[in-house]
UniProtKB/Swiss-Prot annotation:
Domain of life according to the entry: Bacteria
Record-linked InterPro entries: NqrD, NqrDE/RnfAE
Pfam families according to UniProt: Rnf-Nqr (PF02508)
Species per Swiss-Prot/TrEMBL record: Shewanella halifaxensis (strain HAW-EB4)
Protein name: Na(+)-translocating NADH-quinone reductase subunit D
Protein family according to the UniProt entry: Belongs to the NqrDE/RnfAE family.
Record keywords: Cell inner membrane, Cell membrane, Ion transport, Membrane, NAD, Sodium, Sodium transport, Translocase, Transmembrane, Transmembrane helix, Transport, Ubiquinone
Membrane-spanning residues: 14-34, 42-62, 72-92, 103-123, 131-151, 178-198
Localization per Swiss-Prot or TrEMBL: Cell inner membrane
């Protein structure tokens, strides 16, 4: 049985110390695509966290009964089933956001973070620790998405969650939105800057040279 200290480390470690995007550079494609608005970034964070946490839990419960030769197929079947459930829930209760996220919810099936944690962690770790690891990695993923989404929506459109924050020139205000921030390449540069900031703060994350 895991103690509170271990659970806390598993839950909080992926936020900065072992962030799946900033340190492991996983899940970057969806991060580029869904961060033009805070709403889509938040919903994608919740979707991935739910899938990652529960896939870890179910795979961990079954880990001693899964033949090694078919473990990847079993993992993907569990992940795909959860993604279908999440996608159907989004389409039922948040249809507009589901349309904006388009195929990226479905692509959680092949997200490196989800598959990586299932194979590297859940297959070797008890259920509770695996579940908390899934939540922690989802939060770490979301921390980057929401940081990038905050900058892109605020300075690219003058709003947050669709609510105007900076009064735009076109509406008689003072702020001229930077349309470049709404384009996917801007997310790439912002994520790069966040990685630089985190690795400056924690230099032990920098890869050894040579």
């Amino acid at each position: 049985m895991a103690n509170a200290k271990e659970l806390k480390q598993v839950l909080t470690g992926p936020i900065v110390s072992n962030n799946p995007i900033a340190l492991q550079v996983l899940g970057v494609c969806s991060a580029l695509a869904v961060t033009s608005k805070m709403e889509t970034a938040l919903v994608m964070t919740i979707a991935l966290t739910v899938v990652c946490a529960f896939s870890n839990l179910f795979i961990s419960i079954l880990r001693n009964h899964i033949p090694s030769s078919v473990r990847i197929i079993v993992q993907m079947t569990i992940i795909a089933s959860l993604v279908i459930v999440v996608d159907q829930v989004l389409q039922a209760y948040a249809y507009d956001v589901a349309k904006q996220l388009s195929v990226f919810v479905g692509l959680i099936i092949t997200n490196c973070i989800v598959m990586g944690r299932a194979e590297a962690y859940a297959m070797k770790t008890p259920p509770m620790m695996s579940f908390m690891d899934g939540i922690g990695n989802g939060i770490g993923y979301g921390a980057i998405l929401l940081s990038v989404g905050f900058i892109r929506e605020l300075f690219g459109n003058g709003s947050l969650f669709g609510v105007e924050i900076l009064s735009k020139v076109s509406d008689g205000g003072w702020y001229q939105p930077n349309g470049l921030l709404l384009l996917p390449p801007s997310a790439f540069f912002l994520i790069g800057m966040l990685i630089w900031i985190i690795r400056t703060y924690k230099p032990e994350q920098v890869e050894a040279k040579g």
